[in-house]
């Protein structure tokens, strides 16, 4: 008769203030966090917006500068005006709290992903706010309040939502959109809306899978540049 196998060793308790990883016998664990951006994140936000302009084939419209973003993005409390959530990833668990920049306005979201293959990110050094802890910025969402007269409720308008190329199709975009939607529900808002380029069929399919309606009958109207400045000389 075969001898009984020895009992398995006890599972080590997670370290204090650390997010315990999911247990999986296979795969490559990746830890993610969504947090409020701060002024120190402006260089990463600027790079992300530029990469988004490249992806959307709209670099001819891109003129944002780091100084311009720094002077306009953080003038009000989060959710009262322009707000940015940053998506960060790491091969190590994140601390459960952000002691360097605590905020009473938002509690960060954490998630553990078990990937089939490791992620190859050749630009990680350009997007690392904390190189010592292997943290990399993988995406962002920029949004602000608007108002629906039909609902008589405020809502959120998403100006930008973007995930860097190495991190796409891994659930990170869903995390960013969910974070905004959850905040809208928490604040009693009536809707979240945004626009999508008509050629971006992958994004359209993704948004529909998330429950969004694509409003075919609406068109975006925009005054900007010289057309906007010309109104300075128009008498009312």
From Swiss-Prot:
Transmembrane segments: none annotated. It is found in: Cytoplasm; Nucleus. One of its GO terms (cellular component) is cytosol. Its EC number is 2.3.1.48. The active site is at residue 207. Its main location: cytoplasm. GO terms for molecular function: N-acetyltransferase activity; protein-lysine-acetyltransferase activity; protein-N-terminal amino-acid acetyltransferase activity. Keywords: Acyltransferase, Cytoplasm, Nucleus, Transferase. The keyword Cytoplasm applies. It holds the Pfam family Acetyltransf_1. Expressed throughout the plant. Acetyl-CoA binds at residues 161-163, 169-174, 200-202, 207. Residues 96-235 form the N-acetyltransferase domain. Probable protein acetyltransferase with dual specificity triggering both N-alpha-acetylation (NTA) and epsilon-lysine acetylation (KA). This is GCN5-related N-acetyltransferase 8. It comes from Arabidopsis thaliana (Mouse-ear cress). The lineage of its organism: Eukaryota, Viridiplantae, Streptophyta, Embryophyta, Tracheophyta.
């Amino acid at each position: 008769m075969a001898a009984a196998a020895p009992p398995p060793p006890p599972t080590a308790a997670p370290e204090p203030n650390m997010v315990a990883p999911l247990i999986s016998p296979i795969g490559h664990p990746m830890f993610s966090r969504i947090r409020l951006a701060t002024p120190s994140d402006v260089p990463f936000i600027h790079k992300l917006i530029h990469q988004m302009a490249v992806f959307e084939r709209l670099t001819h419209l891109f003129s944002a500068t780091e100084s311009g973003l720094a002077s306009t993005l953080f003038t009000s409390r989060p959710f009262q005006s322009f707000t940015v959530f940053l998506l960060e990833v790491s091969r190590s668990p994140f601390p459960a709290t952000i002691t360097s920049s605590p905020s009473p306005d938002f509690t960060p979201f954490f998630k553990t992903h078990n990937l089939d293959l490791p992620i190859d990110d050749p630009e990680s050094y350009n997007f690392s706010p904390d190189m010592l802890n292997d943290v990399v910025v993988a995406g962002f969402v920029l949004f602000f309040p608007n108002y629906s007269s039909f609902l008589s409720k405020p809502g959120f308008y998403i100006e930008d939502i973007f995930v860097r190329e190495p991190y796409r199709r891994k659930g990170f975009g869903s995390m960013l959109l969910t974070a905004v939607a959850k905040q809208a529900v928490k604040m009693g808002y009536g809707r979240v809306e945004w626009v999508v380029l008509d050629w971006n069929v992958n994004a359209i399919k993704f948004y529909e899978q998330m429950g969004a309606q694509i409003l075919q009958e609406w068109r975006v109207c925009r005054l900007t540049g010289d057309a906007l400045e010309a109104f300075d000389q128009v008498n009312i």
